[in-house]
């Protein structure tokens, strides 16, 4: 009886670990990012990182940093002088290439490569699953590095 229970437990563990939904988890992040970037066409209206809909794309920790930074810089541009999703102030993104890979349960890393107004741009995202939905946990881009770190550093500097 004990052997049968152990065998069933092992079989159940193998099923859970090999279940296709785990493999598809990171791939489900691509439609999320495509939806985010869909607004970055001429005439589009991307989500304001400090607006009420920001929670639909940013994870709670990054959103808290963005909102705290906004208060800390007292109306100055600061780290967010450009939109971190497109690394731009003006946009007309026509073609985007996305690659996504799993970084463990509920975490993924994505790279977006695109041309915006003739400028080749690469932006990397750390994504986290929040309530079963993908959210941006950090953004990495040339010249900025980690958005989370840049915001935290700016908040610390403003407090001095």
Stretch-by-stretch model annotation:
Residues 1-4:
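Positively charged n-region of N-terminal signal peptides that target proteins for export
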Residues 6-16:
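Bacterial N-terminal signal peptides
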Residues 19-23:
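Sec/Tat signal peptide C-region and signal peptidase I cleavage site
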Residues 24, 58-119:
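Surface-exposed, charged secondary-structure patches
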Residues 26-45:
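Short, aromatic-enriched amphipathic alpha-helices that serve as compact interaction elements
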Residues 28-33, 54, 147, 151:
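Stable alpha-helical elements in mature extracytoplasmic
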Residues 98, 122-128:
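Hydrophobic/aromatic beta-strand elements that line small-molecule binding cavities or substrate pockets
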Residues 103-107, 111, 117-120, 138-160:
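Low-complexity, intrinsically disordered terminal/linker segments enriched in charged
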